[in-house]
């Protein structure tokens, strides 16, 4: 089980990320990114803090943290809508390092679906983070490809404010890294043993234009429909954490607005109908938080290592609030809602600096790891599927209730709520919506002979 040292480590890392993102990833910066303005300074601050290489082994210059330790950073990135793919980059660099591939500089986007090869080019119509990333780590017909943005022809996808877009590359500019699978951490080494050339011309994936496109339905003619590949699991995990963090912030904004907006002589948060809706919203937010914790459990973990509830449960009324009002913040869950009150913060810690040592760590070991076992950067397949499915399921309901409480002001360009709800709806579909992942979960459950309860237990324990 997780111990106090792990909790403190998570708090230190999450607090450092919270401070950095609060200072560098403002709503103004996100609006600038949506308009195509550069955000290089914000990215450099994040990379200098060490977050991008948090999952890379220490022997390769990273922090060597286990997958679960990355969740507080991803939640903070979601709360502040970081306009660069830090969650994707952390997971992509960890995966590349684990498979012996060079890690390119700059932010990396994960694109498990939507890219295809035809007429000597690789192309996609809705490539994630294409307007702000420097590379795309893509899955095409069971192969991993590293695509540099400098060589890409990028076009708008026509969606207002989207950081995704259309892109294409000459095949000669792309680097094939070899075959990938969902549960084999060693398979990346196969691609380094010379079976494939630089552009992956092995006779199955050549240049004759007869290439299927890997879509969110998982069908590409070569892979089982109920076996998500590694990049799909990584992307699902990243989006689960981002959505959970963004929903925390949306709930905080809604609570604050409900307690300050007066109607008929009292705050609207004191009306029972509004309280009931926000209660439903809070349930969805906390379900998403727990789902994200489940998704960030790596394949190498302690049996029975269930995700823990992050510091603070749904609180009672805060001091000074009138009876019947809605609590203004959830301590420990949304540090951004309470500036300066971050439980577990290190006194005197430098803003934005990732803690260089974790209290529970021993030399050469990573916090929370099993003795003698290197934690995997890969999430458990069913844990990632459940995490993404549940957060995607919660996203539209949270967004709808937030806009219902805010009314017309919530959709105005000047108000920040629409920045969050637009991304929640985008991220709900990214890397597969809840219906896509529900199909995988159901197919996996039907393959076994467990009861429903036993299946849930095995998923929660990473044994499914």
What label would you give each PLM region?
Residues 63, 67-74, 78-98, 111-113:
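Hydrophobic alpha-helical segments that drive targeting, anchoring, or assembly
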Residues 1-80, 186-188, 195, 237-464:
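Alpha-helical interface subdomain recognition
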Residues 87, 94-245, 252, 311, ...:
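FAD-binding core of flavoproteins
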């Amino acid at each position: 089980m997780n111990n106090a040292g792990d909790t403190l480590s998570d708090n230190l890392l999450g607090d450092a990320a919270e401070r950095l993102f609060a200072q560098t990833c403002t709503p103004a910066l996100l609006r600038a990114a949506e308009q195509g303005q550069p955000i290089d300074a914000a990215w450099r601050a994040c990379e200098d803090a060490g977050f991008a290489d948090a999952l890379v082994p220490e022997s390769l210059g990273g922090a060597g943290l286990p997958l679960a330790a990355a969740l507080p950073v991803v939640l903070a990135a979601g709360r502040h809508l970081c306009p660069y793919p830090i969650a994707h980059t952390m997971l992509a660099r960890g995966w590349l390092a684990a498979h012996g591939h060079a890690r390119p500089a700059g932010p990396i986007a994960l694109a498990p679906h939507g890219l295809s090869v035809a007429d000597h080019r690789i192309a996609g119509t809705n490539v994630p983070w294409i307007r702000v990333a420097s590379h795309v780590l893509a899955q095409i017909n069971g192969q991993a490809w590293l695509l540099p943005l400098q060589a890409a022809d990028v076009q708008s996808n026509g969606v207002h404010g989207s950081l995704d877009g259309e892109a294409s590359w000459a095949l000669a500019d792309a680097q094939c890294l070899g075959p990938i699978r969902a549960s084999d951490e060693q398979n990346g080494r196969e691609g380094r043993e010379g079976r494939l050339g630089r552009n992956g011309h092995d006779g199955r994936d050549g240049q004759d234009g007869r290439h299927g496109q890997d879509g969110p339905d998982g069908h590409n003619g070569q892979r089982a429909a109920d076996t998500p590949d590694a990049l799909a699991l990584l992307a699902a995990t990243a989006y689960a954490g981002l959505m959970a963090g963004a929903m925390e912030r949306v709930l905080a904004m809604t609570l604050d607005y409900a307690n300050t907006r007066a109607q008929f002589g009292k705050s609207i948060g004191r009306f029972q109908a509004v309280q009931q809706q926000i209660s439903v919203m809070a349930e969805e937010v906390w379900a998403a938080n727990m789902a994200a914790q489940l998704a960030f459990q790596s394949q190498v973990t302690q049996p029975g290592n269930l995700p823990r509830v992050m510091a603070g449960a749904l609180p009672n009324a805060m001091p000074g609030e009138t009876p019947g009002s809605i609590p203004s913040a959830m301590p420990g869950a949304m540090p951004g809602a309470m500036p300066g009150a971050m439980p577990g913060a290190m006194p005197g810690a430098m803003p934005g600096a990732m803690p260089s040592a974790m209290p529970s760590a021993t030399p050469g070991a990573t916090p929370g790891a099993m003795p003698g076992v290197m934690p995997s950067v890969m999430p458990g397949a069913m844990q990632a599927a459940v995490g993404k499915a549940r957060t995607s399921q919660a996203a539209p309901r949270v967004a709808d209730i937030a806009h219902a409480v805010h009314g017309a002001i919530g959709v105005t360009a000047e108000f920040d709520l629409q920045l969050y709800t637009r991304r929640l709806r985008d991220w709900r579909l990214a890397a597969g919506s809840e219906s896509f992942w529900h199909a995988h979960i159901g197919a996996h459950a039907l393959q076994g002979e467990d009861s429903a309860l036993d299946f849930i237990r095995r998923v929660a324990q990473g044994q499914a």
